[in-house]
Amino acid sequence: MHVVYPGSFDPLTNGHLDVIQRASRLFEKVTVAVLENPSKRGQYLFSAEERLAIIREATAHLANVEAATFSGLLVDFVRRVGAQAIVKGLRAVSDYEYELQMAHLNRQLYPGLETLFILAATRYSFVSSTMVKEIARYGGDVSKLVPPATLRALKAKLGQ
């Protein structure tokens, strides 16, 4: 089965990478879909191309993982790449409530499309891209929260 794992990934965290690695063991092919939201231009720390490069570097050891950018409806991207399902990581109940609504909406737009949830590993359940950016902006150590590719990109971007 071919699945899509969508997100902003601004930046990629160890939590994201854990979901990608686990999905790669469960599914034949995983496409990491990097959202490029035109209405949020200027709000991202990293451009879509930079996020894509970070993901590709961090997942280079996973032969069945690819990454691509998309804008517009996720269901259109899923159709375009020929995937059968969406994979989402869940950290907390609040994630579940939001993702459940999105799963129902996506299924309404694309009947038969499945959304599969992977629970975050406990050690990453508190990690978010927003928190990583905030800590990094203030010079805090995020090395245990992000893969080496992200750490290098953060240091370069923030001049550290």
Curated annotation (Swiss-Prot):
ATP binds at S8, F9, H16, G89, L90, R91, E99, Y124, S125, F126, V127, S128, S129, T130. Reversibly transfers an adenylyl group from ATP to 4'-phosphopantetheine, yielding dephospho-CoA (dPCoA) and pyrophosphate. Substrate binds at S8, K40, L74, K88, E134. It is found in: Cytoplasm. GO terms for molecular function: ATP binding; pantetheine-phosphate adenylyltransferase activity. GO terms for cellular component: cytoplasm. This is Phosphopantetheine adenylyltransferase. Its EC number is 2.7.7.3. Belongs to the bacterial CoaD family. Keywords: ATP-binding, Coenzyme A biosynthesis, Cytoplasm, Magnesium, Nucleotide-binding, Nucleotidyltransferase, Transferase. Its cofactor is Mg(2+). The keyword ATP-binding applies. The record marks H16 as: Transition state stabilizer. HAMAP family: PPAT_bact. Homohexamer. All subunits in the hexamer bind substrate. Is in equilibrium between two trimers and a hexamer, and the trimer may be a physiologically important form in T.thermophilus. It catalyses: (R)-4'-phosphopantetheine + ATP + H(+) = 3'-dephospho-CoA + diphosphate. Pathway: Cofactor biosynthesis; coenzyme A biosynthesis; CoA from (R)-pantothenate: step 4/5. GO terms for biological process: coenzyme A biosynthetic process. InterPro entries: Cyt_trans-like, PPAT, Rossmann-like_a/b/a_fold.
